[in-house]
């Protein structure tokens, strides 16, 4: 299954989550496309809630269904912790997620493009694989030749705060994952247990 490239504002409204990270999609019309007001939304089944929660997380991180499901299965093999929490941690360990969290990009989509185009390094070596798994202690940086790129500079300057599980050096334009994130540091509006139920239901 290919990555969705259609109108993200429409998907944001349907799922009730801002995929751009700005919240603009929901500021004018918080109800789903096709509805004519917040009070008209139809009741949703248990399966529908599970599917919607899965789609919210998948679209937020911009993964294909195959990538998303593969990472979910990988999380299920981790013995310590819960399946859902481990899944969310693995999503945060993706290189494109760290690039976004460090503030090199204003959106995860932009972060993925920076990685794909070879602007990002891990421990001094260029890595152009967005799904690369970053482990605590590894240093993520911008290539010297890319440090003056306007979108990167603008993104770094716009950051108000970074999560506590990363460190950042503004002068060197580099940072690291100092530790794995705690569940409470991640999206509070998402119920990952519903995603576990969704895939368990499929068998």
From Swiss-Prot:
This is Small ribosomal subunit protein uS4. The gene is rpsD. GO terms for molecular function: rRNA binding; structural constituent of ribosome. The keyword rRNA-binding applies. SUPFAM superfamilies: Alpha-L RNA-binding motif (SSF55174). Part of the 30S ribosomal subunit. Contacts protein S5. The interaction surface between S4 and S5 is involved in control of translational fidelity. One of the primary rRNA binding proteins, it binds directly to 16S rRNA where it nucleates assembly of the body of the 30S subunit. One of its GO terms (biological process) is translation. Keywords: Ribonucleoprotein, Ribosomal protein, RNA-binding, rRNA-binding. Belongs to the universal ribosomal protein uS4 family. HAMAP family: Ribosomal_uS4_B. It holds the Pfam family S4. One of its GO terms (cellular component) is small ribosomal subunit. It comes from the Bacteria. PANTHER family: 30S 40S RIBOSOMAL PROTEIN, SMALL RIBOSOMAL SUBUNIT PROTEIN US4M. It comes from Leuconostoc citreum (strain KM20). InterPro entries: Ribosomal_uS4, Ribosomal_uS4_bac-type, Ribosomal_uS4_CS, Ribosomal_uS4_N, S4_RNA-bd, S4_RNA-bd_sf. Residues 93-153 form the S4 RNA-binding domain.
């Amino acid at each position: 299954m290919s990555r969705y490239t259609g109108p993200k504002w429409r998907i944001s409204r349907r799922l009730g989550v801002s995929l751009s990270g700005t919240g603009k999609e929901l500021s004018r019309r918080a109800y789903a496309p096709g509805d004519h007001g917040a009070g008209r939304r139809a009741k949703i089944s248990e399966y529908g809630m599970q599917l919607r929660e899965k789609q919210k997380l998948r679209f937020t991180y911009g993964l294909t269904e195959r990538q998303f499901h593969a990472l979910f299965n990988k999380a299920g093999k981790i013995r310590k912790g819960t399946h859902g929490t481990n899944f969310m941690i693995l999503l945060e360990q993706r290189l494109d997620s760290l690039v976004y969290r460090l503030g090199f990009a204003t959106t995860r989509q932009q972060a993925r493009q920076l990685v794909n185009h070879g602007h990002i390094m891990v421990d001094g070596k260029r890595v152009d694989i967005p799904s690369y798994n970053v482990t605590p202690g590894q240093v993520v940086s911008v290539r010297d030749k890319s440090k003056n790129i306007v979108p990167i500079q603008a993104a770094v300057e716009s950051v108000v705060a970074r999560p506590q599980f990363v460190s950042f050096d503004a002068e060197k334009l580099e940072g690291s994952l100092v530790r794995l994130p705690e569940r409470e540091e991640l999206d509070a509006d998402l119920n990952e247990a519903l995603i576990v139920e969704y895939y368990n239901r499929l068998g």
